[in-house]
C-alpha cells in the first residue's frame, strides 16, 4: 500500500509558531524523509468559512498568506501538493454521503467540537456547517486515501471520528476507504504550545501569537512580555518551570548547540531549569536566551518568505498545479465510493436489469 500524507490549515490568518512546532516542522521532516509516496497539504478555506461565512474576504486574503508560510517553512511543491480545499468539489459530495453515517449525538460528544463551540460562543446558535466539520475532515482525509495525518494533539478526537466513519462505511458498503494513522510531533513539548500570555493555547483569534512572519523586533518584544512564574518576584527567589511558558518554549525550540552559542555557562536546558528552580536566575536572562534561540529558528523562515513574496505569480501556479493533482485523486476515490454505494447509475449496466 502507498504511504500517503494529508494535512492542512484553515486560512483565517498568518501561521504562528504554534502551527510550526505542532505540525509544520513535522510535515517538512516527513516530506524530506523520502518515506512517503504522495503528500497533500490542504489550505482549508471551505472549513474556514464555517465560522467566517460573513467574511469571505478574510479567508480569501489569507490563502496566499498561508501558502507563503508553507513555502517559507520548507514545504517543497516538487514533493508536496499544496491545494485549495474549495476547488476540489468532490470533497463536498463525500461529506454529504458520510453525514448519513454519523449521528448528531456523536458529533456533540466530540471534545474538539465542544471546545471550539465554546471558544467561538456558538452555544446558542451553531452553524450547521461548523457543527459538521468533523465529517468534512473525514472526507478530506479519505478522499486522498491518506495513511498518515500529521496534526496537533488537539485534533486526536477528529481522527478518531474519521476512523469511525471509515469503519462504518466499509462495514455497510464493503472495503473501500483507507483508515488513517495520526502522526504526532516527536517532541512532546510541541504538542500544545501556549500563547504568550500563558493561559491558553496559542490562537490567532485570541491574539496571543508569535507569527512566523513577525519581524525580529516584534518577536523580541513579544518574548520579553511573556508570562512567567508570578511568584518569581526577585532574582534570588526559586522559580517554577512547570507550566512556565518561557520554559515550555525552550523545551520546544532549544537544542544543545544553542547553549554553546548563546549561553555557554550552561551545558543544557536541564542545568538552566535547575538553576531557575533553586533561585538566582532572573526571568530577563532566560527570556533573552529564548529570544536568541527563536531568532535563530525564525530568521531563515522570514528570509525565505520575503523571497516568495516577490514571486506571487509562481505561488499562484503552485496552488493551481497542486489543486489539479488533488482533484484528480479525490475524483478517483469518489468514483470508488459511488460504486460501492451502487449510486453510479450511468456506469452500471445492471441498473436496468434489477
Label each PLM-derived region with a short phrase.
Residues 11, 149-150, 208:
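A generic structural motif
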Residues 1-3, 346-347:
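Extreme N-terminus of proteins, especially the signal/transit-peptide cleavage junction
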Residues 157, 163-354:
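Conserved nucleotide- and phosphate/pyrophosphate-binding catalytic cores
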Residues 2-139, 257, 296-298, 306:
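N-terminal Rossmann-like or analogous alpha/beta NTP/dinucleotide-binding catalytic cores
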Amino acid at each position: 500500500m502507498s504511504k500517503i500524507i494529508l494535512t492542512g490549515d484553515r486560512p483565517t490568518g498568518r501561521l504562528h509558531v504554534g502551527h510550526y512546532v505542532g505540525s509544520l516542522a513535522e510535515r517538512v521532516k516527513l516530506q524530506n524523509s523520502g518515506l512517503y509516496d504522495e503528500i497533500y497539504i490542504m489550505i482549508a478555506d471551505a472549513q474556514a468559512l464555517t465560522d467566517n461565512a460573513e467574511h469571505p474576504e478574510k479567508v480569501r486574503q489569507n490563502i496566499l498568506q498561508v501558502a507563503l508560510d508553507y513555502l517559507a517553512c520548507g514545504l517543497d511543491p516538487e514533493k508536496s501538493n499544496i491545494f485549495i480545499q474549495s476547488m476540489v468539489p468532490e470533497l463536498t459530495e463525500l461529506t454529504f454521503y458520510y453525514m448519513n453515517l454519523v449521528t448528531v449525538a456523536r458529533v456533540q460528544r466530540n471534545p474538539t467540537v465542544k471546545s471550539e463551540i465554546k471558544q467561538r460562543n456558538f452555544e446558542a446558535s451553531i452553524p450547521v456547517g461548523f457543527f459538521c466539520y468533523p465529517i468534512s475532515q473525514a472526507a478530506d482525509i479519505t478522499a486522498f486515501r491518506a495513511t498518515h495525518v500529521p496534526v496537533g494533539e488537539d485534533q486526536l478526537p477528529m481522527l478518531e471520528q474519521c476512523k469511525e466513519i471509515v469503519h462504518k462505511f466499509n462495514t455497510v458498503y464493503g472495503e473501500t476507504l483507507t483508515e488513517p494513522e495520526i502522526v504526532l510531533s516527536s517532541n512532546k513539548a510541541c504538542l500544545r504550545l501556549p500563547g504568550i500570555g500563558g493561559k491558553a493555547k496559542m490562537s490567532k483569534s485570541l491574539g496571543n501569537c508569535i507569527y512566523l512572519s513577525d519581524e525580529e523586533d516584534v518577536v523580541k518584544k513579544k518574548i520579553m512580555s511573556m508570562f512567567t512564574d508570578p511568584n518569581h518576584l526577585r532574582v534570588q527567589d526559586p522559580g517554577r518551570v512547570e507550566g512556565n511558558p518561557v520554559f515550555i518554549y525552550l523545551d520546544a525550540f532549544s537544542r544543545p548547540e544553542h547553549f554553546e552559542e548563546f549561553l555557554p555557562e550552561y551545558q543544557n536546558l536541564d542545568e538552566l531549569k535547575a538553576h531557575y528552580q533553586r533561585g538566582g536566575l532572573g526571568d530577563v536572562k532566560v527570556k533573552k536566551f529564548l529570544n536568541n534561540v527563536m531568532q535563530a529558528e525564525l530568521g531563515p523562515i522570514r528570509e525565505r518568505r520575503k523571497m516568495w513574496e516577490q514571486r506571487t505569480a509562481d505561488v499562484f501556479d503552485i496552488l493551481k498545479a497542486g489543486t489539479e493533482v488533488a482533484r484528480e485523486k479525490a475524483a478517483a476515490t469518489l468514483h470508488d465510493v459511488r460504486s460501492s454505494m451502487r449510486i453510479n447509475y450511468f456506469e452500471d449496466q445492471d441498473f436496468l436489469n434489477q
